[in-house]
């Protein structure tokens, strides 16, 4: 895929977010002017960090498609499933997949805990839940040999400490490209403590 095609798709996606956001609150209204500089840039940073990822990719709590749609645009070689229980947001994601011609992306419109195990090689989540709660979802849907890519805000260190009381895991942290206090957590070897 050419860089210009990817850039065009990202611009189209940003336009879709702006168009649909007033009706279904895909991203905070206060950050609508930061779609490219914050939301898409965060997701592109994840794609860069996970550039060697292979196999299936599951994005939990996809909402407006961050990072799921961006991963699908930049990594069309991956089979990507976006899990979103809100039917309206699921409709947005399906529309985005259609308009952006992303044949390897699909939407699972169910609650995370109601899905059969997905056994993902890669799993992402952004702004979904505190890490201690998120770990149960990750453990359910990530392959034992898989990697979780969790985008966390300013409290990520406290969340990691809390999660370590119930879980053991290998952790590599990557500073966010858009917020020096935020991080992308690369988690492998997840198991109960």
UniProtKB/Swiss-Prot annotation:
Keyword Transferase: yes
Catalysis performed (reactions): guanosine(527) in 16S rRNA + S-adenosyl-L-methionine = N(7)-methylguanosine(527) in 16S rRNA + S-adenosyl-L-homocysteine
Ranges that cross the membrane: none
Ligase listed as a keyword: no
Protein location: Cytoplasm
EC number of this enzyme: 2.1.1.170
Molecular function GO labels: rRNA (guanine-N7-)-methyltransferase activity
Record keywords, A-Z: Cytoplasm, Methyltransferase, rRNA processing, S-adenosyl-L-methionine, Transferase
Top EC group: transferase
Cross-referenced InterPro entries: rRNA_ssu_MeTfrase_G, SAM-dependent_MTases_sf
GO CC annotation terms, alphabetical: cytosol
Gene3D superfamilies: Vaccinia Virus protein VP39
SUPFAM superfamilies: S-adenosyl-L-methionine-dependent methyltransferases (SSF53335)
Binding site for S-adenosyl-L-methionine: 61, 66, 112-113, 126
Protein task: Specifically methylates the N7 position of guanine in position 527 of 16S rRNA.
Family, per entry: Belongs to the methyltransferase superfamily. RNA methyltransferase RsmG family.
Annotated protein name in UniProt: Ribosomal RNA small subunit methyltransferase G
Organism per entry: Paracoccus denitrificans (strain Pd 1222)
Gene, per the UniProt record: rsmG
């Amino acid at each position: 895929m050419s860089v210009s095609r990817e850039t065009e798709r990202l611009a189209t996606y940003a336009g879709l977010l702006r168009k649909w956001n007033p009706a279904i609150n895909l991203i905070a209204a206060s950050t609508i002017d930061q779609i490219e500089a914050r939301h898409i840039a965060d997701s592109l940073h994840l794609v860069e960090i996970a550039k060697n990822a292979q196999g299936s990719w599951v994005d939990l709590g996809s909402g407006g498609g961050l990072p799921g749609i961006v991963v699908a645009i930049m990594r069309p070689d991956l089979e990507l499933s976006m899990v979103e229980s809100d039917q309206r947001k699921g409709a947005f994601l399906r529309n985005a997949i259609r308009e952006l011609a992303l044949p390897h992306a699909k939407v699972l419109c169910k609650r995370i805990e109601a899905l059969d195990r997905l056994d993902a090689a890669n799993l992402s989540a952004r702004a979904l839940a505190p890490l201690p709660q998120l770990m149960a979802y990750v453990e359910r849907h990530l392959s034992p040999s898989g990697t979780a890519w969790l985008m966390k805000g300013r409290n990520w260190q406290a969340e990691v400490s809390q999660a370590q009381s119930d879980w053991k895991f290998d952790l590599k942290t990557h500073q966010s490209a858009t917020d020096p206090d935020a991080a992308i957590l690369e988690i492998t070897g997840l198991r109960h403590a």
